[in-house]
Amino acid sequence: MPRWYLLLLALAGAQRLQEMAVSRRHERQVEGRRAASRSFPLMVGVHVALFTLPPLEVAGLQRRSRAPVLWISLLGAATALRLWSIRSLGRSWNVRAVVPSDLRPVEVGPYRWIRHPNYLAVVVEFLALPVAGGAWLSALLLSALNAIVLLDRIRDEERLLREVPGYKEAFGRKARFIPGIF
């Protein structure tokens, strides 16, 4: 397995761990309602698998990466979108879908155009990170599992967000992931 791929996985994993620390800090700072927690353990499991299955596939099946620069660039763009989303939400962002009681609709950054730019970024990462190393099967399996978990999570999260004053007016006509399409 290429060392650069292990380094890429390590960097992406370290970033996820750092985001968990930020999320915990944000959760301690706010009072709010939490989306149903049933999806969170599944989400954690799928994310752990994102960092374990691809290297096993690459090593076990002796996969070779095709166009790694393209996939790493796509991963970089998705990561930039995710970080922009997190920064735009500020202290409201967390991984457990806790909706602060004083939340107002956030319409800055990528939220000007879509409701869930962070989840869009994660969807792209679930494709790009495995494929960058040549793990096509992992990308397909993990993307499917991630989609199932995200659909449940988004449904629960939007149920809480609809109770936020001004949310329906701000986001009712915005697409979830792709402006004007979906």
Residue ranges and their predicted role:
Residues A21-R38, R63-F182:
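Cytosolic-biased juxtamembrane loops and peripheral soluble domains of multi-pass membrane proteins
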